[in-house]
Amino acid sequence: MIKDKQALEGGRISILGARVHNLKNIDVEIPRNKLTVITGMSGSGKSSLAFDTIFAEGQRRYVETFSAYARNFLGNMERPDVDKITGLSPVISIEQKTTNKNPRSTVGTTTEIYDFFRLLYARAGEAYSYLSGEKMVKYTEDQVLRLILDEYNGKKTYLLAPLVRNRKGHYKELFEQIRKKGYLNVRVDGELKEIFHGMKLDRYKMHSIEVVIDKMIVSEADERRLKESLKIAMKQGDGLVLILDAETNEVRHYSRRLMDPVTGLSYSEPAPHNFSFNSPQGACPKCKGLGQVNLLDMDKIVPDPSLSIYSGGIVALGKYKNSLIFWQIEALCQKHGVTIKTPIRDIPEEAMDEIMNGTDERLQIKNDSLGSSNYFLSYEGVAKYILMQQESEASASAQKWAGQFIKMATCPECNGWRLNKEALSYRIAGKNIAELSAMDISELYEWLEGIEEKLDPKQLRIATEILKEIRSRLRFLLDVGLDYLSMNRGSATLSGGESQRIRLATQIGSQLVNVLYILDEPSIGLHQRDNVRLINSLKQLRDTGNSVIVVEHDKDMMLSADYVVDMGPKAGRLGGEVVFEGTPKEMLRVDTLTSSYLNGNTEIAVPAERRKGNGQFITIKGASGNNLKHVDVSFPLGTLICVTGVSGSGKSTLINRTLQPILSQHFYHSLEDPLAYDVIEGIEHVDKIVNVDQSPIGRSPRSNPATYTGVFSDIRNLFVELPESKVRGYKPGRFSFNVSGGRCETCKGNGYKTIEMNFLPDVLVPCEDCHGKRYNRETLEVRFRGKSIADILDMTINMAVEFFENIPTILSKIKVLQDVGLGYIKLGQPSTTLSGGESQRVKLATELAKRDTGKTLYVLDEPTTGLHFEDIRVLLGALNKLVDKGNTIIVIEHNLDVVKSADYLIDMGPEGGRRGGNVLFTGTPEALAKSGVGFTAPFLKEELDIANKKK
């Protein structure tokens, strides 16, 4: 018994009695130092087991090691509902959700590769002058002495020490100090002058001042005198001296610091922070290291010039209100001979400029609200107010408000490089640090391969170890399929899958051992071509001496794992059990929903015929945003279109950043600007665009499927019509848990109360008054067919379909939720507990329930994220229903089950990043498979061949 226990705790992670969310008191054993895949349908309990049980307990144990004082600042960790977990190593979770939105965070800073770049340039970079382009030089005093003796031998010269360079001031005190030290001459703004008592300059002009340390005819005989004078000049000039040729009046600079010998420009000794755009010493002074500056978008501030300011022509101000800013604008208009009711297009340009940008003139404010008093006030303008809200530490809502009137433009000073001129003037093998950061990872890796040959011996000695670290980290990024990214790519622009794989590469590079890693679908956004490299990376993490748990649905990942835990049998209340645990080989021999898809007994069938569409097209011509190569693309309407291609090939740029914003601006006056394109045709053939993504349907537990689909309003209206409600005079608000009246006021309609436990985790307990039902006693007394409003919210969709079968207005909205495979979730289930796949299907169901014209364009970006084979089958059924109504669906997808089910494919590539951005193929899946063009074709051909063999 003791031996078994030791084996269990030493070789396995043992979870006993897990009851988090829908887990049904399950026991699971996961082998340590192995690659384990947890799979199952969406909502079956995979994430509840991996993240909400195993990771949550690991994190809680870590925090428990801190003192009570430290835990007070860290926040409380809730104890997961589990009896016991043994064999748990320190846990690191690598999820998709934690994308960094900080504009200063880049791929380079996240992976720490940019830190090594900074070190490399600070220690081995060659400095060049940003004024003349000359290589910067620095000398010792002995070298300067030798150079002067060689270059000026026999010439009459002045030895100068610079004191002031291009600064305003009268410098009366400085001249007096120089005079008292015994110096007789100075050079002011290029002119030699004798110092006199009371000497001063024009204080409002820029001046350069050098003191004449010595004047002499240079000769070897006077070497000692020159050496002494040079020493004094170096001290006075802080390491910099000038030699003035008395005959030609030419000046040459010499410095102990890095210096341009032509212009005298000098740099301080470089340090790593001089190359950081997050440091004042390295950042571009104009954009503060962001690479972009805020500019006002006048088309968004004044979208309709035919309106007057009074009528709300300046959208940022809205319609006229009795407030100071409108009184000031009235005064400005009066000054220019117009009124606040004049159409904006008829207001003089000078007047509009002052309204937007302010005026130095103090305006006389007259208004009835001020009585007979007159006020004279300065006016700063609408523009300054908007920019102030955006750039100051205003509230998030104020910044969001200002953001809609602002467009980001590339910084004109640094051209988007983020760094100051000095930092950009250091080079290694002809490249500055920003140019390296702009290279794709694959391109950068190739460039670094031959770099040693281009370095001098000193540089090579310094750079060898740094280059080794950089190459190592780049190799890990290449292994996880991120060859198309660049170091300067902003973290905020990365997809969840990309940011997750970056963190995975960083963890592999950290070489930690005895750690438990938990990953959430790392294959998201990854083309089949790159899947093998990802799997090898996970195995490398395992072989280093770590345990790896992956929540995944990818077939190749499951078959490559050491161990598989299959959750099910279905989802929600019908899930939460372990239906299989063992090796992939063992799994293929058992009868579960997952194994039936893996062994080929069940499959998603290829459509018998492809839709041809309605003969109409939307065509984009000349799309050139990001890496798109000025492409022309036509989308056949009335079909299911799938956009494919390797990661970074331009799929999202074409659909999410070009097509969707064009249509959103056309139909909804959206504020998001599309990326560059020449023209769009056929826009009249659709009447709206809908993006069905996997984002939550609500941000608070008060949001649920009933409220999102709108069926809750119908249910509340039904309750209002009941005789009991009419007698009591109840209105629809009575049956809402969000407003006072019908809700339980003890818990404010939450159904539970939060008990603060100080240094222990907060505890959620059911409300003692409503017992979790959210409503007060009087509201719950009103019943329909024996059920209160709380009972109905507690029903699953399947139960609700039966219950409301005779009420068409309610049934139509609930039935579609059942049709998309969500029969197991509750009507009142908090939106925060729904998975991404479940949220997406709630949105799809809502669209299916709408009465539509058959002219809608739907966009879905990787809808199979988080979906099991069975979920994908149901999803495709829902998508096909929408297309059968005449609508058009564009799906960005790598999943071959979706690709083979499409009517029309647009394959992008051939590679990612700069080597992508072309349309390789358009046509049916069969035609692409036959063509052999690009990386998608061979995988699709294999999939279609398997399907054809089974027919």
Segments from the language model and where they lie:
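Conserved phosphate-binding elements of NTP-dependent enzyme cores
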Residues: M1-K951
